[in-house]
Amino acid sequence: MFNETPVFDYEDIQLIPNKCIINSRSEADTTVTLGKYSFKLPVVPANMQTIIDEDVAEMLAKDGYFYIMHRFDEAGRIPFIKRMHEQGLIASISVGVKEYEYEFVTSLKADAPEFITIDIAHGHAESVIKMIQHIKKELPETFVIAGNVGTPEAVRELENAGADATKVGIGPGKVCITKVKTGFGTGGWQLAALRWCAKAARKPIIADGGIRTHGDIAKSIRFGASMVMIGSLFAGHIESPGKTIEVDGEKFKEYYGSASEYQKGAYKNVEGKKILLPAKGHLKDTLVEMEQDLQSSISYAGGRDITSLKHVDYVIVKNSIWNGDSI
């Protein structure tokens, strides 16, 4: 029962250190396996149009990182798969659940992508279950990620339908306003929702949304995530597809939600917004910093790889870990 579930979020939790057993943090192994493939980090940039495009996807794949291409260039998906496969790289795409997507999935038999993510806001739906079953029938070797969900019941149903991983998080993201527009979601208790869902899961969980610091990656792993999807921390880089805007001599980049009017092209069923982020440096530099910070997390956990993070103790400190400091 949910009433028995402790409610907390990332800023409420502090992990407790164990004795360090490695000589240098650089010895810590941050790699993760998803399906048949291993990746440098247990993180994936959000499959949003201001976060990833074909060039960013190619760069990530070449450097050994996981990626999920967004679904908003429907006609470009098959050429993208061919582009990646011609270079010996994995193809990881997104689909929706509309009728024409069934025909599209069937058309992929000749050149199936390694990963397909079923990407809708409310993933605990009969339409998602049907699409999982269709993909598994047509492309049995493709790893299927389904979401987004926020309850153990949803995780179990999608897994039982054939999903290889589920994405947990409804509305906790920086440019998502689902909780305000609908009254529903995991905003404000995303980490507790992750813990709740992970206890029911038999397959990998991808935590999606609410990540504000690199330390939140370690916390996500502690509470059951195999992979962590991140939007805002990956937005605003030189390589990011978001439009660059200059305000009073300072450069910013657009970052907007997939359910925003800017993505949809019309103000209809809007559950996302647009913000401007100060322009950052190169994406590779952020990835290196994430890796180094996660290596430090592993050293504090008293382990050699990310599995050690799953077993550390923690305290709930309720909104006090910043102690008046800002990030």
From Swiss-Prot:
Active site (record annotation): 176
Function, as annotated: Catalyzes the irreversible NADPH-dependent deamination of GMP to IMP. It functions in the conversion of nucleobase, nucleoside and nucleotide derivatives of G to A nucleotides, and in maintaining the intracellular balance of A and G nucleotides.
Oxidoreductase keyword on record: yes
Protein name: GMP reductase
SMART domains: IMPDH
GO annotations of cellular component type: cytosol; GMP reductase complex
Keywords, sorted A to Z: NADP, Oxidoreductase
Keyword NAD: no
Record's signal peptide: none
Protein family membership: Belongs to the IMPDH/GMPR family. GuaC type 2 subfamily.
Superkingdom to which the source organism belongs: Bacteria
Species annotation: Streptococcus suis (strain 98HAH33)
InterPro entries: Aldolase_TIM, GMP_reductase, GuaC_type_2, IMP_DH/GMP_Rdtase_CS, IMP_DH_GMPRt
Catalytic activity of the protein: IMP + NH4(+) + NADP(+) = GMP + NADPH + 2 H(+)
